[in-house]
A protein has these predicted regions:
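A generic structural signal for well-ordered alpha-helical segments
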Residues: 43-44, 102, 121
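ANL superfamily adenylate-forming
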Residues: 123-185
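Conserved ATP-dependent adenylate/AMP-binding module captured primarily in the ANL superfamily
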Residues: 99, 109-133, 179-196
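Conserved AMP-binding/adenylate-forming
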Residues: 32, 54-57, 71-115, 194-199
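Short acidic capping loops at alpha-helix termini that bridge into adjacent secondary structure
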Residues: 81-84, 155-156, 173-174, 191-193
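Short loop/turn segments at beta->alpha junctions
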Residues: 59, 116-117, 172
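Short secondary-structure boundary/capping elements
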Residues: 35, 62-69, 90, 94, ...
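N-lobe entry segment of adenylate-forming
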Residues: 1-77, 81, 142-162
Length: 199
């Protein structure tokens, strides 16, 4: 008896595609309360070996591991869920990794712009202010890249406060996801397009 030749890779791709709702992949809608960090986890299921930062060369999996290291480091220095954390101006891509580490523990990132540190402490309760002189890679590398979040924020919870235009503007995880999606549509960006970002 002759059996037909099946392309298992193609079958798996078709099954995965059938599980998508529009451009939302299964991992993104199966997590009860998706957030920015949930999307990074989802990217690693399908694109773990894709290079997302050219210099230094960092893949999706490397980025995720740096986030995990950073989350463990942040906990070790006393950062708590929902606590605002001022993001220092670090060498690229350390600030970008730091913000995801902040979100991974359920804390809130603060872009201070030109606002003085003392003004931040008067406007935000219990803000953690990190030094501009740290090297995140050196600080976090001694910590495990396994991190189990004790708190996962809901979409409506604060993710980012920005003082770059004066008064603080508060953005939730939902706001960030919607804004990113709107930018993607406005610029007609296709899936897997690489963009340079330097916080």
């Amino acid at each position: 008896m002759n059996y037909p030749d099946f392309d298992l890779q193609k079958i798996n791709e078709n099954i995965y595609s059938a599980q998508c709702i529009g451009n939302v992949e299964p991992i993104e809608f199966m997590i009860p309360y998706p957030s920015m960090s949930a999307l990074i986890e989802g990217q690693n299921i399908k694109y773990s070996n894709q290079t997302i930062i050219a210099k230094p060369k960092i893949t999706n999996l490397d980025f995720f591991n740096y986030i995990q290291n950073t989350a463990n480091w942040l906990e070790s220095i006393g950062v708590k869920p929902r606590q605002p954390v001022a993001i220092p101006k670090l060498e690229y891509p350390q600030s970008e990794i730091l913000i995801y580490g902040i979100w991974q523990i359920g804390a809130v990132g603060v872009l201070r712009g030109h606002t003085a540190k003392k003004n931040l402490t008067s406007q935000l309760n219990e803000i953690a202010i990190l030094s501009d002189d740290i090297n995140l890679f050196d600080e976090a590398k001694q910590f495990s890249n396994k991190y189990n979040p004790k708190y996962k924020p809901n979409l409506g919870e604060e993710a980012l406060i920005t003082f770059e235009t004066g008064d603080g503007i508060k953005l939730s995880h939902y706001n960030l996801l919607v804004n990113a999606n709107s930018i993607q549509k406005a610029l007609n960006l296709k899936s897997r397009t690489k963009i340079y970002c330097n916080i």
